[in-house]
């Protein structure tokens, strides 16, 4: 990694957004812990998976699974996590919209079912961009969110709406599901945190308590971000290593 960093230093110049766009407001990140409403179902699924891994691959593989490497490959646990979070998420969003009547909010998701569940409650005030949304429609949807005061909620699939659009009408970004690629979160955050934004941007990461969400954050996203920082900056400590900071903040809240 150190050799790669030295090589990159000789062929590239990295300019940080905070240095180039110094007038941008702050970005404030927070975790929102959510109790799983399907706790028993989730725990059974995880127990069954770990038992299967132990039987098939031995203790070491099972230990890795409990730390997310094996579990992550099982999308069923991720789907159970968001299924169990939905009630808490819906309640949180309704409270936000009631308490902030003049504000808009951006929601990023992964699964199609999550979007369907959200639209049951917010279809009258929401717009959606997902993978099969035509390019021409995307432009209209973004313009509607940016300019129509009646539209309060933007719901986007992170892969489809996390880059290439401007959503500065809102200063609140929410990640309802946790994926494995750290830079996808940073890119998606910046749909609101970009030129034209006048307010501090609040970013919320919704984590299912004692679930795969926390395991991905600790065991996958944090190490990946550290490796990225070492390759690009030559050090693992960086203000871009957001996931370690987020989890430290979560731990402080629970003390």
Model-derived regions: residue spans:
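Hydrophobic residues at beta-strand termini and immediately following loops
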Residues: 32-34, 129-131, 206
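Conserved nucleotide-binding/hydrolysis micro-motifs of P-loop NTPases
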Residues: 38-40, 113-114, 134, 160-162, ...
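Alpha-helical elements of the RecA-like P-loop NTPase motor core of helicases
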Residues: 43, 87, 116, 120, ...
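Conserved helicase ATPase core of P-loop NTP-dependent helicases/translocases
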Residues: 106-108, 116, 123-161
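A conserved SF2-helicase RecA2
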Residues: 180-254
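A short beta-strand element within the Helicase C-terminal
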Residues: 165-178, 201-205
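Inter-lobe coupling linker of SF2 helicases/translocases
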Residues: 1-103, 203, 221-222
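A generic "structured core" feature
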Residues: 105-106, 141-145, 172-174, 180, ...
């Amino acid at each position: 990694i150190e050799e790669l960093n030295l090589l990159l230093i000789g062929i590239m110049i990295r300019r940080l957004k905070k240095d180039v766009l110094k007038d941008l407001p702050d970005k404030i990140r927070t975790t929102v812990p959510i109790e799983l409403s399907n706790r028993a179902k989730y725990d059974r699924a995880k127990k069954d998976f770990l038992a299967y891994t132990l039987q098939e691959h031995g203790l070491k593989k099972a230990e890795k699974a409990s730390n997310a490497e094996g579990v992550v490959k099982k999308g069923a646990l991720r789907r159970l996590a968001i299924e169990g979070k939905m009630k808490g998420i819906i309640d949180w969003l309704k409270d936000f919209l009631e308490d902030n009547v003049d504000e808009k909010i951006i929601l990023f998701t992964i699964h199609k079912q999550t979007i369907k569940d959200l639209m049951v409650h917010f279809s009258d005030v929401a717009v959606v961009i997902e993978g099969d949304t035509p390019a021409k429609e995307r432009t209209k949807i973004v313009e509607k969110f940016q300019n129509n005061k009646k539209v309060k909620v933007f719901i986007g699939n992170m892969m489809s709406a996390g880059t290439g659009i401007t959503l500065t009408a809102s200063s609140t970004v929410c990640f309802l599901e946790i994926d494995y690629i750290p830079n996808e979160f940073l890119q998606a955050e910046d749909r609101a945190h970009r030129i034209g934004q006048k307010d501090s941007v609040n970013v919320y990461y919704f984590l299912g308590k004692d679930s795969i969400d926390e395991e991905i954050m600790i065991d996958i996203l944090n190490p990946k971000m550290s490796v990225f920082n070492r390759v690009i900056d030559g050090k693992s400590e960086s203000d871009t290593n957001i996931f370690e900071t987020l989890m430290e903040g979560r731990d402080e809240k629970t003390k």
